[in-house]
Every structure is written in C-alpha cells, then in structure tokens.
Amino acid sequence: DDFDIIILELSSFQLELIDEFRADISVLLNVFEDHNERYGSYEVYQKTKTKIFLNQRNSDYAVFDDFYLSEKILKGINPLPKHVLFKDNEFNDLGNKISQNGIIKKFLPALIKVTDILDVDRNFVINQLKKFKNLNHRIYEVCSKNGVSFINDSKATNPAAANFAASQFKDIYWILGGLSKNNDLTKLNLSNKNIKKIFLIGSSSDQLSQIIPKKVKFEVSHNLENATRSAYKEVLKNQKGCILLSPGCSSQDQFIDYQERGNKFTKIVNNLVVKC
C-alpha cells in the first residue's frame, strides 16, 4: 500500500504457481531454451512463461515481441489483455545515442513501451538509462587494467545468454561450462571470430570439448580457479583481451548458485591483479 508501482521479475518456477496473481502490465522478454531437465521441451518451457498473462483483464496490458504473436503462444489465454508489441530493432537509433551497453539496447524496446503506458516522460527515461550500470554477475566488469578486462557474467546459465555476452566483446578468453540442464549446447556460438581461446569447467566439459570447432583453441581447466589463472596467462602474452566468465550452464555442479560462482571469480581476479 506504500507504493504506486511494484515491479516483479518472475521466473518460470514462480509462474508455475500462479493462481490468483494478476499483473496490470505484464512483459514477456526473450524466451530461449532453458531448464530442459525440468520441462522436457522448449515448447513446455515457453508455455510456462506465458502464464504471466493469466488473470489479466481486457483493460490490462501485455507487452511482448511481435515474434511471439506469430508463434501463437498466446493461444488459449482468455480474456486476452491489450497487446503492446515491440521489435528487437525498434529504437535502435535511440539506443545508440543513449549508450553502447548491449543490455540497454537489447531491452530498450520493451522498456520504452512500458514507460509510455505509464506516461513517464521520455527524456526522464533516457537520462536515467545514461546512468545505468550492469548488476553484479550480469556482464559486470570486475576489473580493467593494462588492456585486459575481466567480465563476470555468471548469471548466463543457458547458451542464449552466453552468446549475447560473447557478442559484446573482442579478443575473448571465454570461461565456459557447468551443469547443462539438458540444454542443447550446440546452440553456443563457438565459431565467434572474436574467441581467442575457450577454458572449460564443470560437468559439461567433455560434452563441450566434442563440439568446439577444430579451429578454436581450448583447454579443459576443470575448475574456475584453474580457468581464470590460465586465461590470464594467455591474455598477458597478447597484452590485450577480455576474460569472460559467461558459462552458458548452471553452477550447481560446483557451486551453490550463480552468485557464489561469480563471487569466486571476483575473488580470484582480485588476487591475480594488484590494485585493479
């Protein structure tokens, strides 16, 4: 009762439990294959995500990529709230003016649509976005020194998220692997021309080693500390590069969660690089 607006980020696990929950404005962002060990197929996972629209009224709003309308994933939801569609490349020019931050540009269309519904001044939105800093474990720069950057993207627990992170950098020394969750790891873009070397960790190492293209250098590092230290040695040889922890897999084979994994990476980096 003390707030005018409450913003909730809901996982598929939480959406499974929806009974009476109703959103005035619901937003469906990117839905890529994940949690196959739980749902068995991408289609079931996708359908679970659409539960965010349940219980909405005709006067409410559903904000989603127009791709989902063509895929008919809203079929069966009745009554259907007002549609507010966006496209991935919508507001590209505005995004380039605001920031080179890939996360901002990726989600700007949905954000603009929601703030327009709420009648928030566009200039206010733009000014706030210019101040935006990535959250920890989400393409977060731990350190940058002497041409070497360390990026903590431990939250990237599926191939699509890892691919997005890797698309943001050049001269990448990529720390990859963990618990696959039965996801299709062949969807990882391991032919990315900016990859210098891949360092494999966790239980998916053997599986990943079988699908890495022959032209791409890699080593099986087994654990995060070995991978980070080995990547640092490699990047120092070239005197520039990005050591990217974006595992594309869950962390529970070696860690409690992605946060513990990301914090471990940060600690290793701080021990490696003095006065970063």
Task: Give, region by region, the residue ranges found by the protein language model.
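Nucleotide phosphate-binding/pyrophosphate-handling subdomain across enzymes
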Residues: 100-195
